[in-house]
Amino acid sequence: MSLFDTINAGGAELLGFAWPTVWAVVRILVVSVVILLCVAYLILWERKLIGWMHVRLGPNRVGPGGLLQPIADVLKLLLKEVIQPSAASRWLYLIAPVMTVVPAFAVWAVIPFQAEAVLANVNAGLLYAMAISSIGVYAVILAGWASNSKYAFLGAMRAAAQMVSYEISMGFALVLVLMTAGSLNLSEIVGSQQHGFFAGHGVNFLSWNWLPLLPAFVVYFISGIAETNRHPFDVVEGESEIVAGHMIDYSGMAFALFFLAEYINMIVISALAATLFLGGWDAPFEFLSFIPGIFWLVLKVFALLSVFIWVRATFPRYRYDQIMRLGWKVFLPVTVVWVIVVGFWMMSPLNIWVK
């Protein structure tokens, strides 16, 4: 019996009919607190890593080695006044930052941390994740419109166009995973990557989806960078053009919520990429399978997040027309062609996904 089964059985015996509700609330709170801590130290890791790439030290004054810098940043933002422009639509202006964070948290309901460790093990988990992660752009549009500022509105329109341009390519990449796994359940998708010739010989990482679906994996991850408005796709908030885009009139914690959502979405994209293409909680080699699965998932997510940061420190910002061209003229045709190729592959005698 696993730890979760033991807790569940003990709680049901202690609290009776009220236990399912209490257990659900406890799991949601635990996951939410862990995500907030991860965001805080992801920001510190980003500043440290970029500092090292620039041959600097990065934050190193608050606490030992700068470990308390995230706490100092949060306290600073909490103490700042939330200023509202006189021409803004009051309630919409205040609701928009909250609307960016809620979908970012909601996606975690279906992401499995290891076998049987998931908030909601639903059969349509992949569809839910795709749908709920697309809602955040509406908050960006709302923020740009409610601010009643030309720069904010321009940033919001850029965000809408960018989301539409890359959401389709991401969707086709996920269709490929659905075709090969035969399920929308994220736990079953991880399970489908644990079979095959290489997995049977103990080399698990060669059985993961990243190898046969490599174009889809690359398109999904780069599209994820664009979806989160990260560098080099950050024309939505391009400092040299429109200062801060849709966030230009926000301050204090309202401003911080936009960045909180951005970093949560970075972790979501990395967690989904690890789950769909990198075997989720599966160990790369069979002889390492004694290590808890959540360790491997965290390691894969950390590696992908480091790629996010490396891309920011390395590449120049794309022009707006270059971003649109990449989405429509490169990624979309590549994913459509690969869907057709994999379809014929699965119908041929060389099908490697036979269950």
From Swiss-Prot:
It catalyses: a quinone + NADH + 5 H(+)(in) = a quinol + NAD(+) + 4 H(+)(out). The chain crosses the membrane at residues 25-45, 91-111, 126-146, 170-190, 205-225, 253-273, 290-310, 330-350. It is found in: Cell inner membrane. Its EC number is 7.1.1.-. GO terms for cellular component: plasma membrane. Disulfide bonds: none annotated. Coiled coil: none annotated. It comes from the Bacteria. InterPro entries: NADH_UbQ_OxRdtase_su1/FPO, NADH_UbQ_OxRdtase_su1_CS. It is an enzyme of class 7 (translocase). Keywords: Cell inner membrane, Cell membrane, Membrane, NAD, Quinone, Translocase, Transmembrane, Transmembrane helix, Ubiquinone. Pfam families: NADHdh. The keyword Nucleotide-binding does not apply. It is a multi-pass membrane protein. GO terms for molecular function: NADH dehydrogenase activity; oxidoreductase activity, acting on NAD(P)H, quinone or similar compound as acceptor; quinone binding. The keyword Electron transport does not apply. Its main location: membrane. GO terms for biological process: aerobic respiration. Belongs to the complex I subunit 1 family. NDH-1 shuttles electrons from NADH, via FMN and iron-sulfur (Fe-S) centers, to quinones in the respiratory chain. The immediate electron acceptor for the enzyme in this species is believed to be ubiquinone. Couples the redox reaction to proton translocation (for every two electrons transferred, four hydrogen ions are translocated across the cytoplasmic membrane), and thus conserves the redox energy in a proton gradient. This subunit may bind ubiquinone. NCBIfam families: PRK06076.1-2, PRK06076.1-3. NDH-1 is composed of 14 different subunits. Subunits NuoA, H, J, K, L, M, N constitute the membrane sector of the complex. This is NADH-quinone oxidoreductase subunit H. It comes from Burkholderia cenocepacia (strain HI2424). The gene is nuoH.
